[in-house]
Amino acid sequence: MKQLVTFKIHDGGQEYESFGVYDHKYSDVRIIEDFFSIENMREDYDYKDNYWWYDDKLVSVVDRVDIDDDKIKIMNDYGVAYEHSI
């Protein structure tokens, strides 16, 4: 089974969420690296409370919930979340 991963992004005065579907086996840091296409996450990218710097934004994994294949297809069809392979 896969997980629906919810990202919180702070971009200046704006805050929004984005979603991706990943295997259970990956850490939050590895998922952030993949989702935001960060080549090598460095220690100094760590900010606080599990937020990481990405360009001029703070990003974090705020939720991971199990999701079945039918729901993955629906999310994909509506362009809400896509399945990622690392």
Label the predicted regions.
Residues 1-4, 17-18, 49:
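Short, surface-exposed beta-edge/turn micro-motifs
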Residues 3-11:
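A short beta-strand micro-motif
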Residues 5, 22, 68-70:
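Short, low-complexity interaction segments enriched in Ser/Thr/Pro/Gly
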Residues 9, 21, 37-38:
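Generic detector of N-terminal low-structure segments
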Residues 11-14, 79:
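Glycine-centered tight beta-turn/hairpin loop motif at sheet-sheet or coil-to-beta transitions
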Residues 15-26, 30:
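A short, exposed loop/beta-hairpin motif centered on an aromatic-Gly-Thr core
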Residues 38-86:
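Short, mixed-charge low-complexity intrinsically disordered segments
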